[in-house]
From Swiss-Prot:
Physiological role: Sugar transporter.
Residue spans crossing the bilayer: 42-62, 80-100, 117-137, 142-162, 173-193, 197-217, 280-300, 316-336, 344-364, 382-402, 413-433, 443-463
UniProt cross-references to Pfam families, sorted A to Z: Sugar_tr
Protein name as it appears in the record: Sugar transporter ERD6-like 16
Gene Ontology cellular component list: membrane
Location of this chain's protein in the cell: Membrane
Presence of the UniProt keyword Repeat in the record: no
Length: 482
């Protein structure tokens, strides 16, 4: 039996086309009031807090190697190649986790996927803590990478699926913010404690997450899709408050899921067709540029970079990075829906270009024994400008654009491709960074600056402005320019 009417889950309205499901799932319309004055969002807020413990864990894993490089290499007598493998194998695990995350969360639920992630991360941190050589160290790092690869998918999906319309936009931004906070905390406390103790602190968000999962509901949308009718309504009622009328929303979710099931399933070869080719080029290219401006190399090895620039210790620099990242990320969250995507990412790339030039010049001056008193200041200033610029645009905006340029029927497979490209680039950059620095420290940062300049040109020529447009309008714009 064909579905002729589809209820808008967020507004309780009826629409007449399956195509209306193509509208962006995450919106920022705040002008409508809730119909139920006694509606409670305490469980939504608590559930979000539990979920973003996974985001915090993500940041902790990414930020671990920067303040610990010197001490790990010294204590375990690791070569440059061995530590480079330790730093980069995180992304190999994350690639595998990201590719499998969709199937895991569809099979075991969003909560089940988060449990799986937490268990992998706990196992990984314990392996790092008990290691006495490179092998167990790499195994532990791989396990934490797999865990955060799954987290990178399931946390924002879970938050989006449990949140009411008027809170969804704000709550979903907490994912990126908590990643930054997690990495910043690793930078800060990693400068004060041993690398083994820092590994143990990585257990804390996982333990909080596992404990919290016992008290929060499963995603109502997943329960409905899995056919758990009774559990679906219980979970939705728990999220909306015991006195809230969930009839319209529950019916809308069920009808919406039925409508989605009649859409054609996407195939990998569809992504190279003319219909989707431009969107794929935009999504993949932005992820390539995001990684090849060098963020994971600079982030993973910040401490060692400052030492090479002339500091007796890299701790001051990593602390400064931590202090810059959080407020700038908050600012970027505020600006993204006001300034637009294109201006923000181009300004960000311009700042990255400047930061790379300053940092590269500091190493050039040091190598030529010129203006040595200026070298540390130039290095710190350049890296801080780089980090601030990346945090405000190049970090979050490519993910936002990726979520907007693909229609719903190919979003899953296209998103998997884009995530795989992102983690592949992260691995390549983190693995080659130390080798590039050994080859030429100035050349490394000048190379990254070239990618930043190329980003500006690419965005100006290829990327449409998506602010304030529906998904259909964005796709129409892309087709007109094809």
């Amino acid at each position: 039996m064909a579905i002729r009417e589809i209820k808008d889950v967020e507004r309780g309205e009826i629409v007449n086309k399956v195509e209306d499901l193509g509208k962006p799932f995450l919106t920022h319309e705040d002008d409508e009031k809730e119909s139920e004055n006694n509606e409670s969002y305490l469980m939504v807020l608590f559930s979000t807090f539990v979920a973003v413990c996974g985001s915090f864990e993500f940041g902790s894993c990414v930020g671990y190697s920067a303040p610990t490089q010197s001490s790990i290499r010294q204590d375990l007598n690791l070569s440059l190649a061995e530590f480079s493998m330790f730093g980069s194998i995180l992304t190999i695990g994350a690639m595998l986790g990201a590719v499998m995350s969709g199937k895991i969360s569809d099979f075991s639920g969003r909560k089940g996927a988060m449990r799986t992630s937490a268990c992998f991360c706990i196992t990984g941190w314990l392996a790092v803590f008990f290691t006495k050589g490179a092998l167990l160290l790499d195994v532990g790092r791989f396990f934490t990478g797999y865990g955060i690869g799954v987290f990178s998918y399931v946390v924002p999906v879970y938050i989006a699926e449990i949140s009411p319309k008027n809170l969804r936009g704000g709550l979903t931004t907490l994912n990126q913010l908590m990643i930054v906070i997690g990495s910043s905390v690793s930078f800060l406390i990693g400068s004060l404690i041993s690398w083994k103790t820092l590994a143990l602190t990585g257990l804390a968000p996982c333990i909080v997450l596992l404990f919290g999962l016992c008290f929060i509901p499963e995603s109502p949308r997943w329960l409905a899709k899995a056919g758990h009718e009774k559990e679906f309504r219980v979970a939705l009622q728990k999220l909306r408050g015991k006195d809230a009328d969930i009839t319209n929303e529950a019916d809308g979710i069920q009808v919406s899921i039925q409508a989605l099931e009649i859409l054609p399933k996407a195939r990998i070869q569809d992504l190279v067709s003319k219909k989707y080719g431009r969107s794929v080029i935009i999504g993949v290219s932005l992820m390539v540029f995001q990684q090849f401006v060098g963020i994971n190399g600079i982030g993973f090895y910040a401490s060692e970079t400052f030492v090479k620039a002339g500091f007796t210790s890299g701790k001051l620099g990593t602390i400064a990075i931590a202090c810059v990242q959080v407020p700038i990320t908050v600012l970027g969250t505020i600006l993204i829906d006001k300034s637009g995507r294109r201006p923000l990412i181009m300004i960000s790339a311009g700042g990255i270009f400047l930061g790379c030039i300053l940092t590269g010049t500091s190493f050039l001056l040091k190598g030529q024994s010129l203006l040595l008193e200026w070298v540390p200041s130039l290095a710190v200033g350049g890296v801080l400008i780089y980090v601030a610029a990346f945090s405000i645009g190049m970090g979050p905006v490519p993910w936002v654009i990726m979520s907007e340029i693909f229609p719903i029927n190919v979003k899953g497979i296209a998103g998997s491709l884009v995530v795989l490209v992102n983690w592949s680039g992260a691995w390549a950059v983190s693995y080659t960074f130390n080798f590039l620095m050994s080859w030429s420290s100035p050349g490394t940062f000048y190379l990254y600056s070239a990618f930043a300049a190329a980003t500006i040109i690419f965005v100006a020529k290829m990327v449409p402005e998506t602010k304030g447009k529906t998904l259909e309008e964005i796709q129409a714009c892309i087709r007109r320019e094809t």
